[in-house]
């Protein structure tokens, strides 16, 4: 199944109420929030109305919030093998 990965990239400050309601109906809240929506014409129409505010990618699978968090974590560059107690 194919999904749209929708990221809110611009703030909603100063945006008309109708545009805000479209963004809220997509499930986006704060700037940088991410939602996955199944590809269908209704969602595509909503995304076209707010195309200046969102970033859209097409993905094959949906990621859970915990999986998204794991992808954002950086490699610390070391591994703790043994802890010493003082």
Curated annotation (Swiss-Prot):
Pfam families attached to this UniProt entry: Ribosomal_L30 (PF00327)
Gene Ontology biological-process entries: mitochondrial translation
Start and end residues of each stretch annotated as Disordered: 67-86
One cellular component term from this protein's GO annotations in UniProt: mitochondrial inner membrane
InterPro entries in alphabetical order: Ribo_uL30_ferredoxin-like_sf, Ribosomal_uL30_bac-type, Ribosomal_uL30_CS, Ribosomal_uL30_ferredoxin-like
Keywords: Mitochondrion, Ribonucleoprotein, Ribosomal protein
Known partners and oligomeric status: Component of the mitochondrial large ribosomal subunit (mt-LSU). Mature yeast 74S mitochondrial ribosomes consist of a small (37S) and a large (54S) subunit. The 37S small subunit contains a 15S ribosomal RNA (15S mt-rRNA) and 34 different proteins. The 54S large subunit contains a 21S rRNA (21S mt-rRNA) and 46 different proteins.
NCBIfam families for the chain: rpmD_bact (TIGR01308)
Family: Belongs to the universal ribosomal protein uL30 family.
The name this protein goes by in its record: Large ribosomal subunit protein uL30m
Taxon lineage: Eukaryota, Fungi, Dikarya, Ascomycota, Saccharomycotina
């Amino acid at each position: 199944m194919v999904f749209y990965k929708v990221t809110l990239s611009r703030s909603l400050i100063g945006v008309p109420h109708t545009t805000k309601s479209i963004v809220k109906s997509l499930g986006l809240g704060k700037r940088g929030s991410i939602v996955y929506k199944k590809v269908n014409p209704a969602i595509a129409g909503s995304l076209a109305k707010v195309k200046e505010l969102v970033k859209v990618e097409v993905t094959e699978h949906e990621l859970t919030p915990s999986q998204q968090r794991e992808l954002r974590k950086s490699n610390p560059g070391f591994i703790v093998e043994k802890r010493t107690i003082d």
